[in-house]
Amino acid sequence: MLDDSLYKDTADEETKKYLRMNYQKKSRDNARTPMQWTAGHQAGFTSGNEPWMRVNDNYTAINAAAQTSKPDSVYHCWRQVLEKRKALKDIFVYGDYALVEDNEGTVNEKVYAYTRKAAGGETALIVCNFSIDKVAWKFDGKASEVLVSPGGKTVKDLSAGVINLGPCEAIAFLV
């Protein structure tokens, strides 16, 4: 953090410029904004007229209140993920991790897939498309239950042993 006394007591403009530049490099202020709670005044972050950091312009559309009211929001997706993790601790907390290769025996550059297997044998397959392209990913086995699918996939969608994932889409299901 910038030492105020050092900065204020420095008469040399070049030193002030150097101190300011180093502060900006190390500060996290340029990477965050006030939490956007509501679409109201100052995004519900403060009742004051002006927070010390500017509220993002999109606060009327993107805020916590808007997320909690939309069933297909990021908020509800992560709520579902955490509920499943809590309900299936033997798999997701204590289960063994294994990286899954595609059917050609190679690791797909666009897809990150892995299993979590409980001591009792229950297994979840998690498939994440980290690309901006649609991906058809083949898997061995049969899906018995879709746990989390932001894209709305069902067991029927997985019945052919192929998962069609949209850009940046993921799915978790029991096999």
Please describe what each predicted stretch is.
Residues T33, Y112, L125, E145, ...:
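A broad, low-specificity signal marking well-ordered, structured residues that form hydrophobic/aromatic
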Residues Y59, G151-T154:
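Short helix/strand-capping connector loops at secondary-structure junctions
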Residues A118-A119, G151, V175:
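Short, flexible beta-strand-to-coil junctions
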Residues T68, K142, P150, E169-A170:
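Charged, E/D/K/R/S-rich low-complexity terminal regions of large eukaryotic assembly subunits
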Residues M1-A124, F130-V135:
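Loop/helix patches that line or flank the sugar-binding groove of alpha-linked glycan CAZymes
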Residues N129-F130, V175:
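Residues immediately flanking
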Residues D157-V175:
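C-terminal beta-strand-rich structural cap/linker in extracellular carbohydrate-active enzymes
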Residues K134-G152:
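Beta-strand-rich binding/interaction modules
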